[in-house]
């Protein structure tokens, strides 16, 4: 969503567009930047490759427009109840000015560094979430193949070191066979593509990210692109011929 041009000339513009559209929307011939006054601030809440964030910020700066990259974590449930977590990149003074705007939509907003740092942090977040989901799916598959109820395994370990917010949210969905989307497979593919691109650019090894990305791509190819990313468990079900929690 973008506020009407008439409303953003002297105040922040907040953008939620998909990655491929951001540059055109912001920097095109009749883009938002052409209608923003110098001294305005653009807050980008999409999940971009941080390199793209830096390119956009540099172009906006040539028009006298400041920028924050401020992707979020928490998914649809936290967006609905206003408890999103913002990870922000940009100048500290600009961040401090607009932190109250972000906290009107979320429960936390942390400045992680200069432009691009917000999206770098978001990519790190998405790597951890994807790897965690894969680990939960793999572990529960092992348990059931070994003859142990995966729900009891979940109940036993969720309070220990292996427990996590991701496990608490996704293990019950896997066990129930519920893939109603909170965060879709296709969106996670997009984020991990950005993570892989960024990693290759900066020279960071990300073999685990590449592996889980292939699983997500398999789900997409098998008609599950709009399913919740907990559908990673269905990849393991396909390989083993079981249904978690239902073939005991």
Each predicted region: which residue ranges?
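Beta-strand segments within the central parallel beta-sheet cores of soluble alpha/beta enzyme folds
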Residues: 151-158, 210-214
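ATP-dependent carboxylate/acyl-activation modules
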Residues: 103, 244-248
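Active-site-proximal catalytic alpha-helix in oxidoreductases
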Residues: 81-89, 103, 110, 114-146, ...
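Rossmann-fold NAD(P) dinucleotide-binding segment
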Residues: 3-67
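Interdomain hinge/lid region at the active-site interface
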Residues: 115, 119, 163-230, 236, ...
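Rossmann-fold dinucleotide-binding core
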Residues: 48-126
């Amino acid at each position: 969503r973008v506020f009407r041009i008439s409303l953003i000339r002297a105040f922040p513009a907040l953008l939620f567009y998909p990655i491929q559209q951001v540059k055109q929307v912001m920097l095109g011939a009749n883009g938002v930047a052409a209608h923003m006054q110098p001294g305005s601030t653009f807050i980008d809440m999409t999940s971009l490759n941080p390199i793209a964030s830096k390119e956009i910020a540099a172009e906006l700066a040539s028009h006298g427009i400041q920028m924050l990259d401020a992707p979020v974590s928490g998914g649809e449930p936290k967006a609905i109840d206003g408890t999103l977590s913002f990870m922000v990149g940009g100048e500290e003074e600009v961040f401090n000015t607009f932190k109250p705007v972000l906290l009107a939509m979320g429960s936390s907003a942390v400045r992680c560094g200069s432009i691009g740092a917000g999206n770098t942090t978001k990519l790190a977040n998405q790597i951890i979430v994807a790897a965690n989901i894969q680990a939960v799916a793999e572990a529960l598959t092992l348990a059931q193949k070994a003859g142990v109820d995966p729900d009891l395994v979940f109940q036993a370990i969720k309070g220990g070191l292996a427990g996590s917010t991701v496990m608490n949210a996704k293990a019950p969905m896997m066990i129930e066979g519920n893939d109603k989307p909170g965060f879709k497979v296709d969106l996670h593919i997009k984020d991990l593509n950005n993570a892989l691109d960024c990693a290759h650019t900066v020279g960071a090894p990300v073999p685990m990210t590449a592996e889980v990305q292939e699983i997500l791509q398999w789900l997409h190819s098998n008609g599950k692109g709009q399913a919740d990313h907990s559908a990673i468990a269905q990849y393991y079900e396909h390989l083993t011929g079981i249904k978690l929690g239902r073939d005991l």
